[in-house]
Amino acid sequence: MKKTADVIIIGGGINGCATAYYLAKRGIKDVLVLEADDSIGHGGSSRNGGGVRQSGRDVRELPYAMYAVNNMWPTLSEELGVDVEYYQRGNLRLGKTKAHLKKLETLASNARSVGLDMHVIDGKEVKEICPHLSDEVIGASWCPTDGHANPMKTTLAFYTRSLELGARYITGAKVKAIEKVKGKARKVILTTGEVFEGETIILAAGYESRFIARTVGIDVPMTKFFEECLVTEMQPHMFDIMLGTADADFYGHQSQHGSFVFGSDSGLEESIDKSFDDLRTTSITASAGCRAIMGYIPKLADAKIVRTWGGWCDLCFDGVPVIDRVDEVPGLILACGFTGHGFGTAPAVGLMLSQMVAGEDTIVDISSLSYDRFKSLK
């Protein structure tokens, strides 16, 4: 087995796979992806609700989120040769109170400041877009260019195409440390003792990135968060849009197969004591999510849940990721802390990381996502 590569990517989630694809596409084919699990995309990449959204994001994320929606997602299925089930039908973020609408107006105003078409509409307009919602909904933010896609199919499509273009993957390769050689990040050491060497190392391992980065003196202030989703039995067609709420207590959409896919939040996830290897869902989140869903979509009150799943997300302390070369450790690029909403931006992130490796300017300015922003915390 070859133990060297031009680029080593730690993490075989959607960001790692997308980066491998765009690197190989531009001719950098000596790319090695190390994935700790026995399967690709086993973490949050395949365990989210599939939102491809711009609305509700921090303004620091919007430029590349908008780039992905405008320039990448519409042709991604054709490019990767797989139907990733991308639908651009819009996103309603629902509100039931004046406080909700105030929060939504702030989000919409911030989004418009960087050019996103997002505005707040009243209850009548909401019902015109989605008549199946509760009469308690008095308004919503509306972003017509948001959508959704299939996370697993998208992740595996990037994986398959990158393989075809020459990238290599090793699963079951749990990274213990990065080691510097003459001041530069060069070696990746597995828990088995195996050592791989690369000219550039990209750290995209979700929450575990924090522990790996510490081995070269870098600390990204992240915590972990257990994300849970559920799927209902097939229902008559109701809508194609993406839904969320002002309080972010659930989000989801109806799939092309008729089932609904929802992610939900009990508000108590941080108090749930689970090991990182424990992916079992919790009754508290499922019940809280179902109550929220029924409160907004009464017609789903009798729908049966056929499947649930959970996965860990990496929550950065200020809510946006780190995508940056690290000055203190030449040769190391961080791509972590996506805070539960990295799926929709993955094509743009993969492209930008490939540009960083090639020494090019990125498609948009991401200086606000630099590692340097944490230095004031020390």
Question: How does the language model describe each region?
Answer:
Residues 291-378:
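C-terminal catalytic lobe of FAD-dependent flavoproteins
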Residues 64, 93-103, 142-160, 278-285:
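Short beta-strand to alpha-helix junction loop
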Residues 141-192, 196-199:
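Helical element adjacent to the flavin cofactor pocket in flavoenzyme catalytic cores
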Residues 49-129, 249-251, 277, 293:
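Dinucleotide-binding Rossmann-like beta1-alpha1 core, especially the glycine-rich loop
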Residues 24-45:
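Glycine-rich FAD pyrophosphate-binding loop
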Residues 234-331:
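Active-site lid/adjacent beta-loop-alpha segment flanking the redox-cofactor pocket in flavoenzymes
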Residues 194-239:
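Central helical "cap/lid" subdomain
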Residues 2-15, 32:
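Beta1/beta-strand and adjacent pyrophosphate-binding region of the FAD-binding site
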